[in-house]
A protein has these predicted regions:
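Rossmann-fold cofactor-recognition segment
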Residues: 72-85
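SDR active-site lid
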Residues: 191-248
C-alpha cells in the first residue's frame, strides 16, 4: 500500500508512448464508448473514429443517436447503463456484428453537487447507479468479448477519485470506488490478457455540472464549466490507455500545472496522514528511499 501511494507521485505526465493505429491489412479494432453524446465521450468517439477504429457509441436520446450515426466509423447504440435491458441489447448487437470487441470505455457519468447533509438519498443513489453500478454491470456483461480479444477496459475516473472537496461528496465517493474497481479488476483479468486502467481528468469543459444543477436545483461553483478547456487532452489519454503498447495503470490529465500540483500534493498529504503516529511509522529517510525505489520502475518524465 505504501509503495502504491508513493507511486501516485509519478502520474503527472502521459509518458512518451504512441498509440498503435490500425493498418489497412487488418480489421479495425472495435471499442464501445458509453456516454458518447457530449463532453469527454463525444471527444473520445470522434478521435478514435478519425484514427480508423470502429466505435460503438452509447447514448440515450434519439437526436444524439442520429448525430453519432452520422460520424464515419461509428455505430450508435441506445444505452442507459442503469438499465440491464439496454446492456443486454448492446451486447447482442455487438456480438451479432461479428467484429468482436477490443475496448470498453466506461465514460457515462453524472455529478451530484451540494452538501451531503441536505442531499437526498435518491440523488446519492442515482450517482452510484450511473457512476459505479453502471460500469460494473456493463463490464461484467462484456467480459467474454473482451477476454476473447485480450482487450482493454478504460474507465473515466476523476481527480475527485484521488482527493475530495466540498459539495462533491457523492461524486467523489463514486470516483474513489472506480479507483478500487480498476485495481482489483486489473489483478483479476491480467492472467487472461485483459488490461484495465483509468483516466483521471481534472476540470475540463463539459455539461456534467449544468446537468446536475438542472436535475437538483442546486447551483454551486461546479455548475458552469464553460470557462474550462475542451477535453481534447483527455481523449488523447484515452487513446493511449486503449492502444499504446505499454499502457499505464493511471493517466492523470489536468488542464494546467497548478491543478496537477494540487492533486499530487493532496496525495502526498494522505501518505503523511497514513504514516503518522502509528506503531509502524517510517521516518523521512525510509519514505524517501521508498519513493526512489518506485521512481526506478517508472519511465523518465518528459518535460515539454
Amino acid at each position: 500500500m505504501r509503495t502504491f501511494l508513493l507511486s501516485v507521485l509519478l502520474l503527472g505526465c502521459f509518458g512518451s508512448g504512441l498509440a498503435a493505429e490500425p493498418t489497412s491489412a487488418e480489421s479495425p479494432k472495435a471499442v464501445l464508448v458509453t456516454g458518447a453524446s457530449t463532453g469527454i465521450g463525444r471527444h473520445v468517439t470522434e478521435r478514435l473514429a478519425k484514427a480508423g477504429y470502429f466505435v460503438y457509441a452509447g447514448a440515450r436520446k434519439d437526436a444524439d443517436l442520429a448525430a453519432l450515426n452520422a460520424i464515419p466509423n461509428v455505430q450508435a447504440i441506445r444505452l442507459d447503463v442503469t438499465k440491464q435491458d439496454d446492456i443486454d441489447a448492446a451486447v447482442a448487437t455487438i456480438s451479432k456484428a461479428g467484429r468482436g470487441l477490443y475496448g470498453l470505455v466506461n465514460n457515462a457519468g453524472v455529478a451530484s453537487v451540494g452538501p451531503m447533509a441536505t442531499m437526498s438519498l435518491d440523488e446519492i443513489d442515482l450517482t452510484m447507479q450511473v457512476n459505479v453500478y453502471g460500469p460494473v454491470r456493463l463490464t461484467r456483461a462484456l467480459l467474454p468479448l473482451l477476454i476473447e480479444r485480450k482487450g482493454r477496459i478504460t474507465t473515466i475516473g476523476s481527480i475527485s477519485g484521488i482527493l475530495a472537496s466540498k459539495d462533491l461528496n457523492a461524486y467523489a465517493m463514486s470516483k474513489h470506488a472506480m479507483e478500487a474497481f480498476t485495481d482489483s479488476l486489473a489483478a483479476e483479468l491480467a492472467p487472461q490478457g485483459v488490461i484495465v486502467n483509468i483516466v483521471e481528468p481534472g476540470n475540463f469543459n463539459s455539461e456534467i455540472g449544468a446537468s446536475a444543477t438542472k436535475r437538483t436545483g442546486v447551483e454551486t461553483r461546479f455548475t458552469d464549466r464553460s470557462k474550462y478547456k475542451q477535453p481534447v487532452e483527455v481523449a488523447a489519454a484515452v487513446e493511449l490507455a486503449l492502444f499504446e503498447p505499454a499502457p499505464k495503470r493511471r493517466y492523470m490529465v489536468t488542464p494546467d500545472q497548478r491543478e496537477a500540483e494540487y492533486t499530487i500534493r493532496k496525495q502526498i498529504e494522505q501518505l503523511v496522514q497514513l504514516n503518522e503516529r502509528q506503531p509502524y511509522s517510517y521516518d523521512r529517510d525510509a519514505l524517501v528511499k521508498m519513493l526512489d525505489e518506485a521512481l526506478k520502475t517508472s519511465p523518465p518524465i518528459n518535460k515539454p
